[in-house]
Amino acid sequence: MKMYTTAAAGVLLAVAASSSLAQGELKPEKTWEVSAELGAIRTTGNTETESFNGKIDVVHRMENWKNQYIASALYKNDQVEQDDGTEQTETTAEKYFASAKSAYLLADEFSNLFVYGSHTHDEFGAYRKYTTVSAGYGARFIKRESLTLDAEIGPGYFWGDKVEDEDNDIIVKEEGFMVRTAAELKWAFTDNATFNQKLGAEVAEDNTRYVSDTSLSTKISDRMQMKVGYTVNHDTDVADDKEGTDTTTYINLVYNF
């Protein structure tokens, strides 16, 4: 646990230090962009379920820096049939994610050198905890009025708690160097609708993690959107009693502050 805490603290300190340095030398005007999204479902009667997912995305723009902070949570309760035939409400999904990224802007606002860190805690996933740190280069490869494509790549390091035996709570610790790549496509095909595709890969010797988030957003008002999406998380190295791929379909209400 200390290893994860130290890694996460180091990333956050690096982000804070870089931002403070830029503020002290350049004293630019600060610009904040904050969006929050929430989705929840509850059913009663013959089937009782409760599910919740939420996300907050904060972007801080300065003259030569762009910082981004993301936090999300997924929680679900379901009725589960026991060995004796009775049904009992149990938690079937509980996942938390947080990331921080600090990017130094180069010739234009889209080319950058970045430092990135993330931490995932998944009570029911193939990995109970997964922490990464990386640095690299990012750029915008398509820049049109309604269509953009951003991508980044760089080396990094990961720490993972692999669930080897769920019933006996046997955890195997893994760590090692990795290469991280990520891309995001945005297509505003009408004035009120936007398609978004995010892809990411963290390639290491022990495990490769792939992440995909596909979504369609439609405007309800200037500040509010309805968002329908589908996420895929895939790990290549999992225990025999674990699935390598987790998927989530969601409908969220998004508010832009």
Residue ranges and their predicted role:
Residues L216-K219, T245-F257:
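Outer-membrane beta-barrel "beta-signal"
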Residues L26, A40-R42, V58-H60, Y104-L106, ...:
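Residue-level signature of outer-membrane beta-barrel architecture
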Residues L38-A40, I56, Y69-Y75, V115-H119, ...:
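Transmembrane beta-barrel strands of outer-membrane/channel proteins
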Residues R42-E50, E90-A93, H121-K129, E202-V211, ...:
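Solvent-exposed loop/turn segments connecting transmembrane beta-strands
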Residues M1-T31, F257:
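Cleavable N-terminal export/targeting peptides
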Residues K27-R42, W65-Y69, F195:
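Transmembrane beta-strand segments of Gram-negative outer membrane beta-barrel proteins
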Residues N64-Q68, D108-L113, E145-L149, F189-F195, ...:
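Repeated loop/turn-to-beta-strand initiation elements of outer-membrane beta-barrel proteins
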Residues W32-V34, E50-I56, Y96-A100, G117, ...:
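Hydrophobic, lipid-facing positions within transmembrane beta-strands of outer-membrane proteins
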